[in-house]
Amino acid sequence: ECFRPGMTDLEFQYEIEKRMRKNGSIGLFRAFGANMDIYMGSILAGENAETPSPFDFALGGGGIDASCPLGANGTLLKEGTAIMVDMAGNYTAYMTDMTRVFSVGRLTEEAYRAHQVALTIQQEVENATRPGTACSDLYNIAANIAKKEGLSANFMGTEQQAKFVGHGIGIQINELPVLTPRSKEELLPNMVFALEPKFVIPGVGAVGIENSFLV
């Protein structure tokens, strides 16, 4: 319903945002940390996914202005382009966070394989998620699978790789726990976190998945 041939990533995002608001999202993006106030998420199309960002998010994107270098930048959604939709909505005052990937036509086999690896990471991390599990262990599960599949250089970015694969979510989009290799925190009952294993394929775009889990 949102996509039309010839549109840009910005036009695609406007259509998604409109539907989010019409379905109850209040349009608030609340983040913890200085200079983390952005809009309702990001659309990363094609090579724009390779652009690093100063924000502490999984991936970057050039954005429409240097004052907010993140997300959609006017890229034309053409044949062979991967489109990562990472939009944050609300249920009452609580944040939601989900990522899905679409494509215009066929992508490269490497992109499809990397996306499947992201799904495998999600399943293996979910299997290991229980109270008492160390956040660093969950990150290492993800990183080791990426390494085994020869995709370490693409994992969580290329030019600038994020050093986490998941984060807590609640009133703010980025709460504890954070799934990083150096975290000493353990999961507690009823924690909620978003898991987002992603890969950037140069010349194609970003692939991967993001879903939220209750411990």
What feature does the model see in each segment?
Residues 1-215:
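Active-site neighborhoods and metal-handling regions in enzymes and metal-associated proteins
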